């Protein structure tokens, strides 16, 4: 009516239910521990999900269900939150890195692979969404759109700036960051 778009919000790499029901889908650090980027005592939902695991198909199934329930004609777009590069050394990432001839013992190589894998994930998910809803807007939120995102900008329909006057951002974050958006 007034041209205001309302995208559907969903999270990607944090999900309390998935964390509890599918520990085999969680990202693992070099010591074999689940990756918890927030350091919050349990109970929490901050164990990071590995996008190379069986979760990828689950996520696609969830997106398909959302699109079918909402209806393509009612879907303005999809805002996917909590997507970031992870120094993951789970069996899925190790196998994929080995296939690419990468050194799984090198943190630098693991982070290079993490960037590659996240870009690949965004491409796959964007193609998947657009195969069902060609006009849907797509945004992947990883806290900050910056240089690490540049390889996958083609997968975004637009860019957004997340800036809250709380936490680590504060009131001075938005004016400075918006000059670079």
Task: Report residues per predicted region.
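Alpha-helix capping and helix-loop boundary segments enriched in small/acidic/polar residues
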Residues: 113-116, 168-172
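Aromatic- and acidic-residue-enriched segments that line the glycan-binding/catalytic groove
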Residues: 13-42, 80-105, 156-158
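Active-site neighborhood of glycoside hydrolase catalytic domains
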Residues: 54-155
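Short, intrinsically disordered, charge-balanced linker/junction segments flanking boundaries
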Residues: 1-3, 176-181
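Hydrophobic beta-strand segments of well-ordered beta-sheets in folded domains
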Residues: 5-7, 76-77, 157-159
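Active-site-adjacent "subsite" loops/lids of carbohydrate-active enzymes
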Residues: 5-70, 111, 123
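Aromatic- and acid-rich polysaccharide-binding/catalytic face
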Residues: 81, 146-171, 178
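A cross-domain feature marking catalytic cores of carbohydrate-active enzymes
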Residues: 3-12, 82, 140-142, 163
């Amino acid at each position: 009516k007034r041209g205001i778009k309302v995208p559907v919000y969903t999270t990607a790499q944090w999900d309390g239910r998935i964390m509890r029901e599918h520990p085999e889908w969680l990202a693992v650090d070099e010591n074999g521990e689940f990756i918890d980027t927030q350091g919050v005592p349990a109970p929490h939902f901050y164990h990071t999900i590995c996008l190379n695991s069986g979760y990828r198909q689950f996520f696609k199934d969830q997106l398909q269900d959302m699109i079918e329930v909402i209806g393509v004609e009612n879907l303005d777009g999809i805002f996917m939150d909590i997507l970031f590069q992870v120094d993951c050394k789970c069996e899925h990432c190790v196998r994929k890195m080995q296939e690419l001839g990468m050194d799984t013992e090198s943190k630098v190589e693991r982070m290079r692979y993490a960037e590659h894998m996240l870009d690949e994930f965004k491409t796959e998910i964007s193609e998947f969404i657009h195969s069902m809803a060609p006009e849907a807007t797509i945004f992947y939120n990883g806290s900050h759109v910056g240089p690490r995102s540049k390889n996958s900008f083609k997968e975004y329909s637009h860019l957004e700036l997340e800036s809250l006057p709380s936490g680590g951002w504060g009131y001075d974050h938005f004016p400075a960051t918006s000059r670079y958006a």
